Amino acid sequence: MEVDADLELLTSLLEENEAAERNGVVSHEASSELDEFDELFDGDEDGSYHGSDNGTEEQTIGGVEEDFTTLFGDIDDIKEEEAAASDTKKQSSSVCQEKSKDELEDELRKMQAQMKKLQEQLQKTALAKTSSPGNPKKSPENKMVQSGKTSRTSPLIERKKTDSNTVAPQLTSPTVPKAKLPDAPKRKQNLSDKSPVQKKMASFLSPPEKSSARPGQSTATQPITNTLKSPVGQQYHVEKFSGLRIRKPRVSSSEMERKMNGRKLIRLAQLQNKIATEKLEEEDWVTFGVIVKKITPQSSNNGKTFSIWRLNDLKDLDKYISLFLFGDVHKEHWKTDQGTVIGLLNANPMKPKEGTDEVCLSVDNPQKVLLMGDAVDLGTCKARKKNGDPCTQMVNLNDCEYCQYHVQAQYKKVSSKRADLQSSYSGHVPKKMARGANGLRERLCQGGFHYGGVSSMAYAATLGSTTAPKKTVQSTLSNMVVRGAEAIALEARQKIAAAKNVVQTDEFKELMTLPTPGALNLKKHLSGVSPQANCGKEGQPIQSISASTLLKQQKQQMLNARKKRAEESQKRFLESTEKSEKSSTLTSSACSVFQSPKQGAEFPNAQKMATPKLGRGFAEGDDVLFFDISPPPAPKLSTSAEAKKLLAIQKLQAKGQTLAKTDPNSIKRKRGSSSEELVAQRVASHASTSPKSPDENEPAIKKHRDQLAYLESEEFQKILNAKSKHTGILKEAEVEIQEHYFDPLVKKEQLEEKMQSIREQSCRVVTCKTCKYTHFKPKETCVSENHDFHWHNGVKRFFKCPCGNRTISLDRLPKKHCSTCGLFKWERVGMLKEKTGPKLGGETLLPRGEEHGKFLNSLK
C-alpha cells in the first residue's frame, strides 16, 4: 500500500539523517501526511476524531498523530488503523536501513514535486486565506471560528496551507487533546455541482447563525423578555430593507446590499395581493418579518415533524402570515428564538385553511431562511386586563406601549391629570373616602408634620373619627313613633343643661386664670350671657341660625343702636338752643349774626339738620342786608401788638429810614446789587481754594480711548468670559427637568397618534336571528325569552359626518342618517377625534360674507 510505503520511508529518514537535515525531511513528511488524510476529510467532514498519545513511538510521529487526533476525535476505525500502522513501521524499520542514499534523494525529489503541485492547486482554487507564518499552531476553536467566517472552508484544507511553512515547529510542540466540539460546521456543497436555483439560493442566504457560532456556546432558546425589551440609552439604526430596528445584527448592511441586488422586495402587508395578481415564480423576491409566535412542533400523517411560525412586520399587528417548516428546514431552524427578524427567499405559497384568507408560506431549503437578528421594538402591552392579569397583546414599542384595546383607557387616565403634575393626584376626593380612614387627608398625613422646629401629630382628630361607631339598636314601638317639635326641643334643652353641669377640671381652671386673649374673651362671654337668654321661653322652640344670618342680625342691631343715640343727642341739642335764645338780650348788637352753640351742647354738627328760623339774632326794627358785597374787615390786632408796631415805626424814623411799600403786582423777588456781589465773591474764593486734578486738563477723546483700550484688554475679557465651574451640572439638571416635563407629553402624543391610526377594531358581538340585529350585547328580552342569538367575532368601525357628529358601526357603513344634520355622508376616521387648535385669521376671514346654500334663483 502507498500509505505503508510512505510511513516506512518517513521512519527511515527520521532515524538516519542528522539533526540539520531532519527538519527539512520533516517538512516534506508532514505535507505528505496531509495528502494522505484528504480522503478522510472528503469522506466525513463533520466528524471529529480524538486519540491518546503513544509514549513509546517517536516524538515526530506522535506529534503528527496527536495533531490529527485533536482535530477529529474518538473513532474506533482510526485507532485500528493507527495500530496497524505501528506494526508495519516496526517491520519495515530493518528494510529501510538497507536503502542507499541515492534512493532517498530520489524519493525526496518526488515528494518536493508533489508539494509544489499541491501548492499550485491551493492557489488556483483559493478556498481559504493563508494564515500568517508567525502563528506556530492554531487551536481547534480558532480554526472553527475562522472557518465559519470564510465561505465554508474546511478546517483540514486550511491546515494544509499553514503546515507547508510551519510543520517543523508543530511537530516539536505536541498539542493537548481537547474535548469534542459541540457545534461542528457542516460541509457545504460546491457551487459547480448545484442546480441554477441552488446557486441563486446560496448566493442570497447562507446560515448566518454559524458564522457567529462559538464552541461551548449554548444553543438553547433565550426567554422572550430579552428580545422584547430594549436597553435604555442605546440607539439602534433602522435596517434599510426590513424597516425594523435590529439588536445584535448577524448580517452587515453591505452584505445585505449585495444579497438584495437584482431581487424584488415585497412587504408582508402586500404579499396577499401580490400572490393573487402577479406570477412570483418567474422572478426572485424577498420578504422580511418578525417571529411573533411559535406553535409547538407537530407531527404529520407520515410521522414527520414540522413547525409553524407566525410572522408580522410590526406595522399591522392584527394581520400575520404563517410559515411552515418541514424536513431539513425544521431540523435546522426549529430552535430559532421568538422575536427574531428573518428574511425569506422565493417562499412557496400554500393553500389556506378553509374559511380563512390567511397567507401560508413554506420553504424547501434551510438556506432560503436568513436570520438577521433580534427585533428591538417587539413587546407586549403594559396594561392589565379586568381580571388583573397582564395583557398579552403584541405591540410595537417604537409606536406605543399599549395595545388598541387599552390605549383609550390609558389616554383617559393621562388626560385626567394636569400636564404639570403628571405624578400627583389632582382629582376630587369622594365623600365616602374622605370620611373613612382611606381619605386623602389620612393618606397624606401619615407621618406627621414638622414646622417651625415643632413636631405635631399627623392630623387632628375629626368628629367622624372620634365618635364611637353606632351600634345597631333593636327597633321598638317607641322608635317607630314620629316625635313632635316640642319633644325634640325638650330633648335639646336637656342636652344643654347636661352640658352646663359638666365638672370643670383643674387644668381648665389654670388655663382660665392666665391673662391670655382667649381666656379673657371666654370670661367676658360667659359673664355677659344670662341664663334666661340661654334657656329662652318655655313655649318657643330653639331655632338653629346660620352664621350669615347671625351676622346680619348683629349688624342691624348696631345700626338701630347708633340711630337711637343720634336721635337722643339731636333732641338734647335742640333743647339747649331754645334755652339759650330765651336768655339772650334783645339789645346785644355786638354779637355775631350767626351764633355758635354753647359749650354744653353735645351735638354741634346737627345744626344744619335743625329747622331754620328767619331773623335769628336780630331785634325788632333792625335792618337786614341780604346782599352785602363789601370786603370783609381786616382782623384787628390786640393792644400789645399795636403798641409794639408803633414802637418799631418810631425807631426807624429816628434813624431816617422808611419802609417801602410792596408792589402788589410783583411776581418775582428782585435781588439787590449787594447780594449779587456776595455771590460772585463766594464763587471766586471757592475756585481759588479747590486744586485742579490732572485728569480735568486732558481731552475727553483721550479718556474715551483709554476706556476702550481697557474694555479690549485681556484682563477685562477674562473677567467678562468667566463662567461658573458648575455650568455642566446646571445644564444636566435642566435637561433632567425638561425630560421630566416632556416625557408625559410625548407618551400622550404617542397615544393620540395610535388612536388616530386605529380605524377599525375587532370585537365580540352578538346577533339575534329572531329580532334581526347585531350589537355588542344582547337585549334583556332576548335573554329572558330565549331567542336564537349567538356570539361571534365582529369589526367595529368609526365614522364621522361633515357636521362633526361621530358614530360607530359594525357594518361596512352606518345604516342610519346623521342624527344632527340628517345627511348620509359618512367618512372613515380614527378612534380619537382630531383636535382642532385656534384658527388663523385667513381661515376665518370671509371676503364675500357668509356663503348660503340656496339662492333666490334656485327656487324657480
Curated annotation (Swiss-Prot):
<dbReference type="GO" id="GO:0003688">
    <property type="term" value="F:DNA replication origin binding"/>
</dbReference>
<feature type="region of interest" description="Disordered">
    <location>
        <begin position="553"/>
        <end position="591"/>
    </location>
</feature>
<dbReference type="Pfam" id="PF24863">
    <property type="entry name" value="zf-CCCH_Mcm10"/>
</dbReference>
<feature type="compositionally biased region" description="Polar residues">
    <location>
        <begin position="164"/>
        <end position="175"/>
    </location>
</feature>
<dbReference type="Pfam" id="PF09332">
    <property type="entry name" value="Mcm10"/>
</dbReference>
<dbReference type="GO" id="GO:0008270">
    <property type="term" value="F:zinc ion binding"/>
</dbReference>
<keyword id="KW-0175">Coiled coil</keyword>
<dbReference type="GO" id="GO:0043596">
    <property type="term" value="C:nuclear replication fork"/>
</dbReference>
<feature type="compositionally biased region" description="Basic and acidic residues">
    <location>
        <begin position="98"/>
        <end position="110"/>
    </location>
</feature>
<keyword id="KW-0227">DNA damage</keyword>
<feature type="compositionally biased region" description="Polar residues">
    <location>
        <begin position="120"/>
        <end position="134"/>
    </location>
</feature>
<dbReference type="GO" id="GO:0005634">
    <property type="term" value="C:nucleus"/>
</dbReference>
<dbReference type="InterPro" id="IPR055065">
    <property type="entry name" value="MCM10_OB"/>
</dbReference>
<dbReference type="GO" id="GO:0006270">
    <property type="term" value="P:DNA replication initiation"/>
</dbReference>
<feature type="region of interest" description="N-terminal domain">
    <location>
        <begin position="1"/>
        <end position="145"/>
    </location>
</feature>
<dbReference type="InterPro" id="IPR056791">
    <property type="entry name" value="Znf_Mcm10_C"/>
</dbReference>
<dbReference type="InterPro" id="IPR015408">
    <property type="entry name" value="Znf_Mcm10/DnaG"/>
</dbReference>
<keyword id="KW-0479">Metal-binding</keyword>
<feature type="region of interest" description="Zinc finger-like 1">
    <location>
        <begin position="381"/>
        <end position="406"/>
    </location>
</feature>
<feature type="coiled-coil region">
    <location>
        <begin position="93"/>
        <end position="131"/>
    </location>
</feature>
<dbReference type="GO" id="GO:0003697">
    <property type="term" value="F:single-stranded DNA binding"/>
</dbReference>
<feature type="region of interest" description="OB-fold domain">
    <location>
        <begin position="230"/>
        <end position="380"/>
    </location>
</feature>
<keyword id="KW-0539">Nucleus</keyword>
<comment type="subunit">
    <text>Self-associates.</text>
</comment>
<dbReference type="InterPro" id="IPR015411">
    <property type="entry name" value="Rep_factor_Mcm10_C"/>
</dbReference>
<keyword id="KW-0238">DNA-binding</keyword>
<protein>
    <recommendedName>
        <fullName>Protein MCM10 homolog</fullName>
    </recommendedName>
</protein>
<keyword id="KW-0862">Zinc</keyword>
<feature type="compositionally biased region" description="Basic and acidic residues">
    <location>
        <begin position="565"/>
        <end position="582"/>
    </location>
</feature>
<dbReference type="InterPro" id="IPR012340">
    <property type="entry name" value="NA-bd_OB-fold"/>
</dbReference>
<feature type="compositionally biased region" description="Polar residues">
    <location>
        <begin position="144"/>
        <end position="154"/>
    </location>
</feature>
<feature type="compositionally biased region" description="Polar residues">
    <location>
        <begin position="214"/>
        <end position="225"/>
    </location>
</feature>
<comment type="similarity">
    <text>Belongs to the MCM10 family.</text>
</comment>
<dbReference type="InterPro" id="IPR040184">
    <property type="entry name" value="Mcm10"/>
</dbReference>
<feature type="compositionally biased region" description="Acidic residues">
    <location>
        <begin position="32"/>
        <end position="46"/>
    </location>
</feature>
<keyword id="KW-0863">Zinc-finger</keyword>
<feature type="region of interest" description="Zinc finger-like 2">
    <location>
        <begin position="768"/>
        <end position="787"/>
    </location>
</feature>
<feature type="region of interest" description="Disordered">
    <location>
        <begin position="657"/>
        <end position="700"/>
    </location>
</feature>
<dbReference type="Pfam" id="PF09329">
    <property type="entry name" value="zf-primase"/>
</dbReference>
<feature type="region of interest" description="Zinc finger-like 3">
    <location>
        <begin position="801"/>
        <end position="821"/>
    </location>
</feature>
<dbReference type="Pfam" id="PF22379">
    <property type="entry name" value="MCM10_OB"/>
</dbReference>
<feature type="compositionally biased region" description="Acidic residues">
    <location>
        <begin position="64"/>
        <end position="84"/>
    </location>
</feature>
